[in-house]
Amino acid sequence: HLGVMNVFHLPLAVNVQRIDQLRQTKKVIGLKQKKYDISFVGSLYENNYYEQITYLPAHLKGYLDGICRAQMQLSGVDILPELLREDILTELNAYVKLDMDQTYLVTYGRLFSDLFLKKYISSMERKERLELLGKISRIALFSGSRWMGEGIGYYGTVDYMNEMPLVFSLSKMNLNMTIRSITSGIPLRCMDILGAGGLLFSNYQPELEEYFVTEREWIS
């Protein structure tokens, strides 16, 4: 496609030397006593576009809600392209206009799925999993999304370069909940956690198994 003959890929990287120096300076390397039981650093996408659409017909809204719920049950596979049939997209296009010109290399369905549905699914998934875990353990939420629930403590945002690695080091377990637009690759957050010496608890991503040993280097 587009005249490209070869594509080479490497997973994202992390500057372990810089982070180790930071952890050493802050005296968090090798600490047996952790400050947080389970931590999550990230957005809850509570202002996602899909939930702002309040004018869809009931049958269309019901169908989209249903396929979002179905997708939420599956990790490492994207079923939305198959379920967003042409008749559904044609009707949807009458209500939701996307500013697309000929320079766009994606379809209307793909753009709507990535911008609207997948952030909505990620929002539902993150809130539901945090609520579930909050019933059995203490959760430390570091986010711009101010959200409270049983067992969940809100700590605001953290600086990516200097504060976030310390959170991962000071947590017994660190959650990664991959945004649904990343179907198979390793999210940067996984590398952030592992690079800071934290225990990674993540949803399944095919590429994680290609580079790391499950239940030894990360848990799912």
Predicted features along the sequence, with ranges:
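Short, flexible/disordered intra-domain loops and linkers
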Residues: 49-59, 114-121, 154
